[in-house]
A protein has these predicted regions:
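Extracytoplasmic/periplasmic domains immediately adjacent to an N-terminal transmembrane anchor
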Residues: 1-175, 343, 368
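Long, hydrophobic alpha-helical segments
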Residues: 174, 178-195
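Membrane-interfacial helix-loop-helix junctions in multi-pass membrane proteins
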Residues: 84, 167-171, 251, 302-358
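Short, membrane-interfacial amphipathic segments enriched in basic
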Residues: 1-11, 76, 314-325, 374
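Transmembrane helix segments
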Residues: 37-47, 281-321
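Transmembrane helix boundary and interhelical loop/hinge segments in multi-pass membrane proteins
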Residues: 192-213, 225, 370
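Alpha-helical transmembrane segments and their short interhelical loops
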Residues: 33-36, 217-291, 296-299, 342-348, ...
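Junction motif at the cytosolic side of a transmembrane helix
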Residues: 2, 199, 276, 335, ...
Length: 374
């Protein structure tokens, strides 16, 4: 009972110390409000309102159909220019795409020739250029084929494709961006808050006070883990309900309570990583440098940004030892696909095992650090 009381009292002390740290409070608020909203809306993964210009040298019915096929929300209204204005517009960054339809284009198409339509792409706008190139090719090909056939799909295919989008029928970026921002920020804040809590003790000289108190390194470490973990757990829950479901109107398919249980297991592992990094760093700038080395690989290689199957096999095997890989897997299964505990229990069990390993390593390192200070 005495040990539990010490853990509780030390945890309350950590919460009071956090309330006095205005920078950390601002980071918490930003991470689960502005960051979530911007990740969902500012940088869409699909093509959105791309500026496009067309130099129509043919002035035919077919060229008009092609021009009218570029419409919102994928493209802005095409700007009609001359061929001489094309290079200047691309150089000035006014257009991402500039299409040059040659003279006699319709006549050559109907005659069975193969006229060339020049599509110039500003590749400095990487996301739009990569996605829009395929869009434009499909649009032009579709309009030419339908013009030749006089109407679309006049031939009956032997096989009819029935395409249904599961879990995100309208392919909305908000569904993916908002949830992944919360997942990434949970990991980031768990490491930052626990690591900074330990460094704050060292910088303020209160670590020496703890050394003369009847508390063990285990109790000190557990207090930091439960207090900082509780903060991340509460604010992530509020962000999921108020920001994602409320402001962004993103539907959550599964149980939020089950997801929060997964968050708690993930926090057990990531807060232990934060404690370990706090013992290595001697100041907040050093902790920030360590964060770059640790956090970026955890976020980029966990399967949230890029499917794990697209990574080299060695990277996949290494990342299986990291908690973020399993956390992303269970979070996507619960929040996107409505998975129940019977489906995600392997990830829960793996997170618990990985958390126990990281906790043990961090505790041994923390005891060694405390012993050197004594």
């Amino acid at each position: 009972m005495r040990g539990l009381r010490n853990i509780y009292n030390l945890g309350v002390k950590e919460l009071r110390s956090l309330l006095g740290d205005k920078a950390m409070l601002a980071l918490i608020v930003f991470a689960f409000t502005v960051s979530v909203y911007s990740s969902a809306t500012v940088m869409p993964g699909s093509l959105h309102l791309a500026p496009i210009a067309v130099a129509d040298m043919d002035k035919s019915q077919l060229s008009s159909r092609i021009i009218n096929a570029f419409y919102r929300p994928w493209f802005l209204e095409p700007e009609l220019i001359t061929a001489d204005e094309m290079d200047a517009g691309l150089d000035a960054g006014r257009y991402t795409f500039a299409i040059n339809i040659p003279p006699n284009f319709q006549r050559d198409v109907l005659a069975g020739r193969q006229p060339e339509v020049q599509v110039n792409v500003d590749a400095t706008r990487m996301s739009q250029a990569f996605t829009g190139n395929g869009y434009i090719q499909n649009i032009i090909s579709g309009e030419v084929n339908s013009f030749i056939a006089r109407y679309r799909d006049n031939s009956v295919l032997p096989v009819e494709l029935a395409i249904r989008m599961r879990f995100n029928p309208n392919l909305e970026q908000e569904r993916f961006g908002a949830v992944m921002a919360i997942i990434n920020n949970i990991t980031m804040l768990a490491i930052v808050l626990t690591g900074s809590a330990l460094i704050r003790e060292r910088e303020h000289g209160t670590i020496e006070h703890l050394l003369v108190m009847p508390v063990t390194p285990f109790e000190i470490m557990m207090a930091k883990i439960w207090s900082m973990g509780l903060v991340v757990l509460v604010v992530s829950d509020l962000s999921l309900v108020l920001m994602v479901q409320g402001m962004l109107q993103v539907p959550i398919e599964g149980s939020i309570l089950l997801f929060m249980l997964g968050v708690a297991l993930s926090l057990f592992a990531t807060t232990s990583i934060g404690i370990f990094m706090g013992t290595l760093a001697r100041s907040m700038p050093q902790l920030g440098l360590l964060m770059i080395l640790v956090l970026l690989p955890l976020q980029m290689l966990s399967g949230g940004s890029t499917p794990r199957e697209s990574m080299p096999q060695l990277v996949q095997d290494i990342m299986l030892t990291m908690p973020t890989t399993h956390f992303v897997s269970l979070a996507q299964a619960i929040l996107y696909r409505g998975a129940s505990f019977s489906i995600v229990w392997p990830q829960f069990l793996t997170l618990l095992a990985i958390g126990a390993v990281f906790f043990t390593i961090a505790l041994l390192r923390f005891r060694k650090t405390i012993g050197q200070m004594a």
